[in-house]
Amino acid sequence: MRKYVFDAKKTKDEIVEWIRNYFRVNGPGCNAIIGISGGKDSTVVAALCCEALGKDRVIGVLMPQGVQDDIDVAREVVKYLDIQSFEINIGETVNKLLQAGRTGGIVDSHQARVNLPARIRMATLFMVSQSMNGRVSNNCNASESYIGWATIGGDAFGQFSPLGKLTVTEVKKIGFELGLPEKFIKKAPSDGLTGKTDEDNFGFTYEFLDHYIRTGDFDNDVETAAKIDKMHDANTFKEMPMPTFNPNCCEWGW
């Protein structure tokens, strides 16, 4: 079993400085554009950006799909953080794009329907970003990424990723270190697409997954460890940079 120690305060301070450095180099004076779902990841990212940049440079974007019961939590988050926010309902856009595809002869798959809202949300974030002098955050965590629980072109995208190398367990600890209310940190993670919690979809808990990722220990639960390994192996392509052909005729300086 691998040795594992996590210092939440030290890590929080390092992320704050990392965000400052990112904007210093890649967007002096730019705003952080954050899709706010009401879950712990987007809430923690927003709070970190507030500490790093000041709340006046943090903009939350709420993107419910039609009537969405938990959107009130996202509204509470932006009110608690006292940040500027916009609410843009993507329901009509999703439906119209699906209908346009069907009119054009596309028989849309279940996976296409499930992942389309995430992709529309990311397009929406970049629309807001280019209108508000921003840089779009990626709110994924290491637990999700390890098993491919993210949508290419959707929540897996963005321009800077404060939590991408932190597990769900670690993100929660960062949230408490930031002094965020427990209701924001302990809200059951869901995919935001099917109405199920992440753990319902997985068939195992984040606690088990995070412990396995960090230590390699699976407490003799061979079946669950094998399931995690299979999900990881099947989704590593999501973490790879886009393969690009490089011609031999010339040397590129970048």
Please state what every model-predicted region is.
Residues 1-34, 48, 56-59, 66, ...:
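ATP/NTP-dependent adenylation/nucleotidyl-transfer catalytic domains that generate, transfer
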Residues 42, 63-65:
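Extended, folded domain segments that form the structural surfaces/walls around functional sites
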